[in-house]
Regions:
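Helix-start/capping segments and mature chain N-termini
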Residues: 3-7, 22, 27-213
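Ordered, amphipathic secondary-structure segments that act as subunit-interaction surfaces
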Residues: 12-21, 28
Length: 213
């Protein structure tokens, strides 16, 4: 794998290296081969330029009418079977939102279209339980490791109408505050200062973990 990655790396200092590891062609009827023919696909991408302004100014978030199925065997894992996310992104493209809150089929908040969610109520930070759906992103886990007071809960979409602040996180955007939250006919301005403060408090730990801010 290291040889494949080394051969694909361009002479650049910053970007996104995507590595997909597959089990190769399987048998009939979804059966896996006893000894899979593992393949590795590598691609290089630029970091989306919009992320820097998102981090500083915040984004507009709403909802989409696509839910995630509950499947505890896959919950938390980042895998290549992401058909639901394709439907979510298609629905998002028909809105004016930068991203959307995504629930499971029981209306529990899970994540955003390609990021994890955190929200602030009464001075306490919360994030969604991913026991039955969603992806436990590396940035989410980094935040939880360094902020042990964050509560992991099951939360219905209807119960977050009065949050004080909210942010999205993933490995590329890191931490992005939500500037406005639209739920149905209700649109609210959220505070971004608590998010910026949290992001700043994690900067030293982030450099220690990943070597760059």
């Amino acid at each position: 794998i290291r040889q494949v990655i080394a051969a694909a790396l361009p002479e650049r200092n910053e970007g996104v290296l995507k590595v997909l590891i597959g089990a190769g062609q399987g048998g009939r009827g979804y059966a896996r081969l006893a000894k899979p023919n593992i393949n590795v696909a590598v691609s290089w991408h630029d970091v989306p330029a919009v992320y820097q302004s998102w981090q500083q100014q915040g984004i507009h978030v709403g909802t989409v009418p696509v839910s995630l199925a509950r499947q505890p065997l896959l919950a938390g894992l980042k895998h290549a079977n992401r058909l639901e996310q394709i439907f979510i992104k298609q629905a998002l493209a028909h809105t004016d939102f930068d991203d959307a809150i995504v629930t499971d089929t029981e209306q529990n908040i899970i994540e955003a279209s390609a990021a994890n969610l955190f929200w602030l109520v009464g001075g306490q930070w919360f994030t969604s339980s991913l026991a039955l759906a969603g992806v436990n992103g590396v940035m989410r886990q980094f935040i939880l490791d360094n902020c042990p007071d964050i509560h992991i809960i099951e939360q219905q979409l209807t119960e977050i109408a009065h949050v004080d602040a909210m942010f999205l996180s993933n490995a590329l955007m890191q931490i992005v505050p939500v500037k406005t939250l639209t739920l149905g006919e209700s649109k609210r301005e959220l505070a971004i200062a608590p998010v910026l403060s949290l992001h700043k408090s994690l900067a030293q730990a982030y450099v220690g973990e990943y070597g760059a801010a």
